């Protein structure tokens, strides 16, 4: 099942955030934190709002002192997730770096699972436009909590990662950059949609992911619908953003004992600075990586390049 799996590594996240800065800096510059020490205390709130006739529930992680330029990250759960009482592995990064975090819950799909409508075969006929709903929810949250009206970013894992691709393909203007973890481009998106608006995009994916296969699943053996191999999906966005060249480097891992290797592919020179990054976790499985890398810190490092731009 494509769920946002909880790992023991989440319990060590505060430590991992602190020690990840050196490996991340080696690949892409130091992790950029916008908060002062006194602003790192956060507040949690669970709330809801009616959006397009749907009651949308969400959890907010807010800096103690919200500023008019406080950025927002929206985090989308995996298939069947959506328990707003659970702390995510992005919470500690928000606490450290001072951005606001919104964790919305998906609606119940035809199978009775909370999910995002990305066009899985079993979602056929489900009249929910999560692209529009999430953009409206984000705007509402920005206004309600006095956040930056321009610095909003989107990330998600698995089903939430697929929603990230769909958001990019639908030419949205709400999110300045998008990051997917173990997400996929379904074949219907790849062939049926014509993305036209460049957007900075990052994918983090394990090569041994047996749920969201690195090599794709065009025969639809897994039942999620036919989807493209990860390199082909990423290259579509590279072409969209008109990136001019690729830089590949191996990133030091947090725990070398498992034998995994992480390669960062950066596609640079994109229109208006819209670059595409791909973290290839060799040997990595279907997870929010906390052993090889601090995924939350890596995501924020990517997003922070596009603050107030």
In which residue ranges do the predicted regions lie?
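Short substrate-entry loop that stabilizes the transition state in hydrolases
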Residues: 66-112, 175, 187-188, 211-213, ...
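A domain-start/cap signature at the N-terminus of enzymes
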Residues: 24-72, 85, 93-96, 126, ...
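Short beta-strand/loop motif that positions the catalytic acidic residue
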Residues: 203-205
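Accessory cap/linker subdomain of secreted extracellular hydrolases
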Residues: 207-248
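Bacterial N-terminal signal peptides
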Residues: 9-18
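Alpha/beta-hydrolase active-site loop
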Residues: 123-145, 166
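Bacterial N-terminal signal peptides that target proteins for export
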Residues: 1-10
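Cap/lid segment of the alpha/beta-hydrolase catalytic domain
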Residues: 105-129
